[in-house]
Curated annotation (Swiss-Prot):
Catalyzes the sequential NAD-dependent oxidations of L-histidinol to L-histidinaldehyde and then to L-histidine. The lineage of its organism: Archaea, Methanobacteriati, Methanobacteriota, Thermococci, Thermococcales. PANTHER family: HISTIDINE BIOSYNTHESIS TRIFUNCTIONAL PROTEIN (PTHR21256:SF2), HISTIDINOL DEHYDROGENASE HDH (PTHR21256). This is Histidinol dehydrogenase. Zn(2+) binds at residues 226, 229, 308, 367. Its cofactor is Zn(2+).
Length: 375
């Protein structure tokens, strides 16, 4: 049975048997049999376990992320022409779900998704996280508390996606965010249409464009830092320096020596990496040549880990070449643009011939009648 069929069968079983099936899969995959929703006492216990210094670091980081994302907010567009009103208004989603993966705890995932959701005006946020020894990571619970998220569930894998999408054991969400393993990804893919999803996150990627001015160790450790995410992670060095190429020629790193920085940019556009660092004498001059990248980090002191944690820019990025057609997570991913119009009688009468003729061309008679019947 391939992964698509495997996930489909589990989702079908959960749809049919509901909470009973979720309990069985939670026991099977996570070894957990207790209540799913995290209690107020567990929130309190988690906060008590966090060192004060870590609390301060988390608060400072959240402020930086919030500051960056508040600048993204768009104003509604409204204008009047010929006595008619036209516009585009933005409405936040009411309820979303955030999947925070297990394995290594990733509290930064909750920060990077939860903050823009709150900035956008999302009122209800649900978090799911696979339990470890029957508990959710205390840092995740502390961040949830700071973001005023009260619904956190000890749920992982396919069953967590199903619970959020179908509204089993909780209210259904409108859209699911957050990375996961191949089973979570496939579950998200299959529930798309029932709910929205952010993206299908793949292995981490980094490409570095560097010339002879780049510090060799800076470049090397930036490349290696992304390979640390897992064996499927990818790293490319695109450089005009043979010396740097030789120094960074390590296992897992694809090294490409180019004749010019322009050629490096061309290669980067073909790769469309999740993260692109440009460490050259004049990195800003190359930005206009980059068309495909999830994020661009310039200069010696903007490594990917800085962006992952404390710069405030979002680290939820397209992978697997998807940067050719989509971009970084923003507040707009949590909002819906809605067009609005109120046309005056005078403008309608003067312009309706456009619609009447187009309806005739398309052969849809009742569209035409809807326009003609108005006098």
């Amino acid at each position: 049975m391939d992964i698509e069929e495997y996930v489909r069968e589990i989702l079908k079983d959960i749809r049919e048997r509901g909470l009973e099936a979720i309990r069985e899969y939670s026991k099977k995959f996570d070894g957990y049999e207790g209540p799913f929703e995290v209690s107020k006492e567990e929130f309190k216990e988690a906060e008590e376990r966090i060192p004060e210094r870590d609390k301060e670091i988390i608060k400072r980081t959240l402020k930086r992320i919030e500051k960056y994302h508040r600048k993204q907010l768009k104003q509604d567009i409204l204008y009047i022409e010929n006595g008619s009103l036209y516009g585009l208004i933005y409405k936040p989603l009411k309820r979303i779900g955030i999947y925070v993966p297990g394995g290594k705890p990733l509290p930064s995932t909750l920060m990077m998704v939860g903050v823009p959701a709150r900035v956008a005006g999302v009122k209800e946020i649900v978090v799911t996280n696979p339990p470890k020894d029957g508990k959710v990571n205390p840092y995740i619970l502390y961040i949830a508390k700071l973001l005023k998220i009260e619904e956190v569930y000890k749920l992982g894998g396919i069953q967590a996606i199903a619970a959020m999408a179908y509204g089993i054991g909780m209210k259904k969400v409108q859209k699911i965010f957050g990375p996961g393993n191949k089973f979570v990804n496939e579950a998200k893919r299959q529930v798309f249409g029932i709910v929205g999803i952010d993206s299908l996150a793949g292995p981490s990627e980094i490409a570095v464009i560097a010339d002879e001015s780049a510090d060799k160790d800076f470049v090397l450790y930036d490349l290696l830092s992304q390979l640390e995410h897992g064996k499927d992670s990818k790293a490319w060095l695109l450089t005009t320096s043979k010396e740097l190429a030789d120094y960074c020629n390590r296992e897992g790193i694809t090294v490409i020596v180019c004749s010019s920085l322009e050629e490096c940019c061309k290669k980067a556009n073909e790769i469309a990496p999740e993260h692109l660092e440009i460490i050259t004498r004049e990195p800003l001059k190359l930005v206009d040549l980059i068309e495909n990248a999830g994020a661009i980090y310039l200069g010696l002191y903007t490594p990917v880990p800085a962006a992952d944690y404390f710069l405030g820019v979002n680290h939820v990025l397209p992978t697997g070449g998807a940067a050719k057609f989509m971009g970084v997570l923003t507040v707009w991913d949590f909002m819906k643009p809605i067009s609005i119009a109120m046309v005056s009688r005078e403008e309608f009468i003067s312009e309706r011939e456009l619609g009447i003729r187009l309806a005739e061309i398309e052969g849809i008679e009742l569209h035409k009648k809807s326009l003609e019947v108005r006098k």
